[in-house]
């Protein structure tokens, strides 16, 4: 999405978002007491922005993010919420009976595998924006 930002500004934003997402890998490892389970070398896939339109049924149905050979290198998913949508637009984890409320700056990190099907719920009065990406094996 280009809102008039220069190429230099866009690169700076991209670099900062990438750095922020990658820094959460260490926090994730600390929170889960992971020491050697994740690869020592990995990369971040391209960063994507998803817009959920207001007052619609715009949503992502229950799914997993690793479902074929092309996506099989993914081992962590990242959602950086850019907007607050109180009581709507949650990310729901079906088997965990868990809903994550979108709040600006909140980063959700989880394995994108079959154990963690999730859905992006529709929003009501206001649009929802998230930045998403994946860590993958090199």
Regions of interest found by a model, annotated:
Residues 1-107, 115-138:
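Fe(II)/2-oxoglutarate oxygenase catalytic core
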């Amino acid at each position: 999405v280009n809102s008039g930002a220069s190429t230099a500004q866009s690169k700076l934003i991209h670099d900062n978002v990438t750095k922020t997402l990658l820094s959460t890998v260490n926090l994730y490892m600390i929170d889960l007491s992971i020491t050697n389970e994740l690869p020592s070398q990995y990369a971040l896939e391209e960063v994507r922005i998803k817009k959920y339109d207001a007052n619609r049924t715009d949503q992502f149905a229950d799914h997993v993010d690793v479902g074929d050979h092309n996506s099989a290198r993914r081992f962590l998913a990242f959602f950086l919420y850019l907007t607050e949508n109180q009581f709507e637009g949650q990310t729901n984890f079906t088997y965990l009976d868990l809903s994550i409320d979108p709040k600006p700056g909140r980063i959700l990190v989880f394995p994108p595998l079959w154990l963690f099907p999730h859905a992006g719920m529709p929003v009501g009065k206001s649009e929802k924006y998230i930045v998403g990406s994946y860590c993958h094996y090199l």
